[in-house]
Amino acid sequence: MLKLARPFIPPLSRNNAISSGIVLTSRRFQSSFTFLSNQSLLSKNQMKSKRKKGSKKAAYHRQPPEHEHTAPLIKQNKTITKKEHSDVRGSHLKKKRSDFSWLPRVPSTSHLKQSDMTTNVLYSGYRPLFINPNDPKLKEDTGSTLYEFAMKLEDLNEPLSPWISSATGLEFFSEWENIPSELLKNLKPFHPPKEKSMNTNELIHVSAKRNTLVDNKTSETLQRKMDEFSKRRGKGRKKSVVTLLQMKKKLEG
């Protein structure tokens, strides 16, 4: 038999030995103090803070002798100027006060919005409140002035006919929508013809003509009645002459 140089160690026992060796050799080191528990660091920090405070106090108390003499005078002048300023301000406010009690009081308009007001003005038919001067189209030198531009806007705003909308331009009537614009432009309001003043000769002629027409009508009616009586002669007790006379009197009256 051959002799082994090293004794045979099974794998399980080998792993156990390695792990035990690691446990024995590995140690966890932790610091036993912090900044607050270290007295040397705290004392150094306190010394630094004391030096800073001392330097600030020295700079605050270090003033030249001239400044020391003039300091109270400056303060006094400052107080005087403040008082004078307050007096002047108070007198100014007193002068500005005025009595507005005689003016009529109106309800607040805080509930109205600017956007709603501008839209109402835009859709109500009025001219715009302002023209933007920064518009590049207006800045161009076209030879026309702002007045001419406003007149053109006014011409565009005018309706085709006066009866297509109300007098204020707030309401448009729908019955005129289907009528063409060319016909609307040619429409004119109706004016009754003037009565002609007649002369005396013309009046006499008209009255005579009217009388002749009346006489012709009466003669025609009498003739018609006489023809009727002549046809039914001998019928009835009333005489035809009496009825004709009565009829003539009634027509003439």
UniProtKB/Swiss-Prot annotation:
Disulfide bonds: none annotated. It is found in: Mitochondrion. Pfam families: Pet20 (PF08692). One of its GO terms (cellular component) is mitochondrion. One of its GO terms (biological process) is aerobic respiration. Residues 81-90 have a biased composition (Basic and acidic residues). Keywords: Mitochondrion, Transit peptide. Residues 47-60 have a biased composition (Basic residues). The keyword Phosphoprotein does not apply. Residues 44-93 are annotated as: Disordered. Residues 1-36 form a transit peptide. Required for respiratory growth, stability of the mitochondrial genome and for proper assembly or maintenance of mitochondrial proteins. This is Protein PET20, mitochondrial. It comes from Saccharomyces cerevisiae (strain ATCC 204508 / S288c). The lineage of its organism: Eukaryota, Fungi, Dikarya, Ascomycota, Saccharomycotina. The gene is PET20.
